C-alpha cells in the first residue's frame, strides 16, 4: 500500500541558506541556536538541560544540520544508528514566507515577487482601506502598521473592543492580518471582513489575508484562539497534491494545510489546534488512510507560538514533545509507506526582530525502500514534490529532482 505522510515543522530551519545575506539572515540557525541555548542552560523554562531529540536524530536531523552548517549542533554527534535518509534543501522561491515554502515543496516554486507593505507605520494605502471599510460597513480601523500579533493585542485590544474597529497590521511577509475579538466583533464577521480584504487585495499581489481572532478581557489575558483562518491565493500551477487528487487519490489536510493551498488538491480537511491535537489527528488519519493517500500536517505552533515570539525554551520543549511521539507514527507505517519531515522556512527564536529567517530546511525521509544515509544538499524544496510524484507514479513535476 502506498501512502505518504508529510509532517511539516513550520519554521524549523537548519542553518542560514546560501542566499541568506540577501534577506539580512546570514548566521541564522533555528535548530542550531536552540540546541546551543539548551546546552548552555539558557532554555530551562518549562524544561531543562541539553536539547534531547533521539528519534529525530535517528531519522537524520543532526546529520542534515551538520551538512548544512559544517558542524554538529551542541549536544548532537555522529553517534546514533541512522534509520532515515536525510538532506537539507535550499529554497528556490523568491520569499521566505509560508505559501512559497509550501507550494515549492509540492513542486511549484514561487518565481515571481510577492507584493509587500514595506512601510512600518501607515503601512496600507488609503484607497485600499477605504474600499474595505466601505464594503464592510465599518467607520474605521486600528493599527495600520508592522507589528507582532501578540504585542498589538496588548496595545490595541481594549480600544478595539470599545470601538468595534478591526485591527489591521502586517509584517515583513506578504500578508494582511486582521485581529478581532470573537465575543465583541464576532468570528463570522471577522471571516466576512477577511473575504472582502482578500478580494480588494487582488491588485496588490499579497500572498495571504489572515484572520486573527482573539478572546480575553484585557491586555493581561488577551490570547489568540484556535480559529485562525488563512485566505491564500491559489498556487500558480498544479501541485503534486492536485495531481494525486486528479488520479483518484486522497489528500488529507491536518491543520492549516488546506488554507495555504487555497483548498486546491485537498480532498479532506481536519481541524486541530496545538501540537498534541495536531499529532493526535495525524495519527488518526494515518490509521484510517487507504491506498494512494497523502496525510499532510502543518505543526504551526513552532512558528506562531515559539519562532515569531522568540521563545527559545518553548520551541525546545515543543520539539522534545514532538520527538517523544514519533515512535507512535513510526509504528503505524507499513513497509511501503513514505514519511517525510521538513519545514517551510526558518524562524530563529534567537534572531533579531520577529520575522522568518531564510534558512535551509531539513529533508528527512523514511520508508519506501529508502536507504539510511545522506541525500545531500537539495537545490529546491521541489525535490520533495518530485519525489512524491515519483513515489505515486504520477506525471513528473516541472521542478525538482526526485530522491526516490
Swiss-Prot record:
Pfam families with a match to the protein in the record = Metalloenzyme
Q: What class of enzyme is it?
A: isomerase
Question: Which residues are listed as membrane-spanning?
Answer: none
Residues binding Mn(2+) 1: 10, 344-345
Tell me what reaction this enzyme catalyses.
2-deoxy-alpha-D-ribose 1-phosphate = 2-deoxy-D-ribose 5-phosphate; alpha-D-ribose 1-phosphate = D-ribose 5-phosphate
Q: Under which pathway is this protein filed? A: Carbohydrate degradation; 2-deoxy-D-ribose 1-phosphate degradation; D-glyceraldehyde 3-phosphate and acetaldehyde from 2-deoxy-alpha-D-ribose 1-phosphate: step 1/2
The cofactors named for this UniProt entry are: Mn(2+)
UniProt-recorded Gene Ontology molecular function terms: magnesium ion binding; manganese ion binding; phosphopentomutase activity
Q: Keywords, A to Z?
A: Cytoplasm, Isomerase, Manganese, Metal-binding
According to the record, how does the cofactor bind?
Binds 2 manganese ions.
Q: Which Gene3D superfamilies match?
A: Alkaline Phosphatase, subunit A, Phosphopentomutase
Q: Locate the residues binding Mn(2+) 2.
A: 303, 308, 356
Signal sequence interval, chain numbering? none
UniProt xrefs under CDD domains: PPM (cd16009)
Location comes to:
Cytoplasm
This protein's record includes keyword RNA-binding: no
Q: Which domain of life is it from?
A: Bacteria
Q: What's the stated role of this polypeptide?
A: Isomerase that catalyzes the conversion of deoxy-ribose 1-phosphate (dRib-1-P) and ribose 1-phosphate (Rib-1-P) to deoxy-ribose 5-phosphate (dRib-5-P) and ribose 5-phosphate (Rib-5-P), respectively.
Protein name per its UniProtKB record: Phosphopentomutase
According to its UniProt entry, this protein's organism is Shewanella sp. (strain ANA-3)
Q: What phylogenetic lineage does the species belong to?
A: Bacteria, Pseudomonadati, Pseudomonadota, Gammaproteobacteria, Alteromonadales
Amino acid at each position: 500500500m502506498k501512502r505518504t505522510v508529510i509532517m511539516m515543522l513550520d519554521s524549523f530551519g537548519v542553518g542560514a541558506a546560501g542566499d541568506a545575506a540577501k534577506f539580512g539572515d546570514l548566521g541564522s540557525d533555528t535548530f542550531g541556536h536552540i540546541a546551543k541555548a539548551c546546552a548552555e542552560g539558557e532554555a530551562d523554562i518549562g524544561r531543562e538541560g541539553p536539547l534531547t531529540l533521539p528519534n529525530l536524530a535517528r531519522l537524520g536531523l543532526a546529520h542534515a544540520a551538520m551538512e548544512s552548517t559544517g558542524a554538529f549542533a551542541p549536544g548532537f554527534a555522529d553517534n546514533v544508528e541512522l534509520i532515515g535518509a536525510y538532506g537539507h534543501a535550499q529554497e528556490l522561491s523568491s520569499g521566505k514566507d509560508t505559501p512559497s515554502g509550501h507550494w515549492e515543496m509540492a513542486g511549484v516554486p514561487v518565481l515571481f515577487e510577492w507584493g509587500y507593505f514595506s512601510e512600518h507605520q501607515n503601512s496600507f494605502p488609503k484607497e485600499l482601506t477605504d474600499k474595505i471599510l466601505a464594503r464592510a460597513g465599518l467607520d474605521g480601523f486600528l493599527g495600520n502598521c508592522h507589528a507582532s500579533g501578540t504585542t498589538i493585542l496588548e496595545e490595541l485590544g481594549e480600544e478595539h473592543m470599545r470601538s468595534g474597529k478591526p485591527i489591521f497590521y502586517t509584517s515583513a511577509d506578504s500578508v494582511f492580518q486582521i485581529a478581532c475579538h470573537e465575543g465583541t466583533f464576532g468570528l463570522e464577521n471577522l471571516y466576512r471582513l477577511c473575504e472582502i480584504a482578500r478580494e480588494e487585495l487582488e491588485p496588490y499581489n499579497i500572498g495571504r489575508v489572515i484572520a486573527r481572532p482573539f478572546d480575553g478581557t484585557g491586555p493581561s489575558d488577551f490570547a489568540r484562539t484556535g480559529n485562525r483562518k488563512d485566505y491564500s491565493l491559489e498556487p500558480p500551477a498544479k501541485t503534486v497534491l492536485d495531481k494525486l487528487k486528479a488520479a483518484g487519490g486522497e489528500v488529507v489536510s491536518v491543520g492549516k494545510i488546506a488554507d495555504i493551498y487555497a483548498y486546491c488538491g485537498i480532498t479532506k480537511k481536519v481541524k486541530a489546534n496545538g501540537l498534541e491535537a495536531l499529532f493526535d489527528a495525524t495519527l488518526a488519519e494515518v490509521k484510517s488512510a487507504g491506498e494512494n493517500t497523502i496525510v499532510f500536517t502543518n505543526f504551526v505552533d513552532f512558528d506562531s507560538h515559539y519562532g515569531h515570539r522568540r521563545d527559545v525554551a518553548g520551541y525546545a520543549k515543543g520539539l522534545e514533545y514532538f520527538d517523544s511521539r514519533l515512535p507512535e507514527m513510526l509504528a503505524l507505517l507499513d513497509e511501503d509507506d513514505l514519511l517525510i519531515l521538513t519545514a517551510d522556512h526558518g524562524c530563529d527564536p534567537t534572531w533579531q526582530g520577529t520575522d522568518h529567517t531564510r534558512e535551509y530546511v531539513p529533508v528527512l525521509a523514511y520508508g519506501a525502500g529508502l536507504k539510511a544515509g545522506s541525500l545531500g544538499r537539495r537545490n529546491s524544496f521541489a525535490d520533495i514534490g518530485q519525489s512524491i510524484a515519483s513515489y505515486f507514479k504520477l506525471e513528473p513535476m516541472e521542478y525538482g529532482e526526485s530522491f526516490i
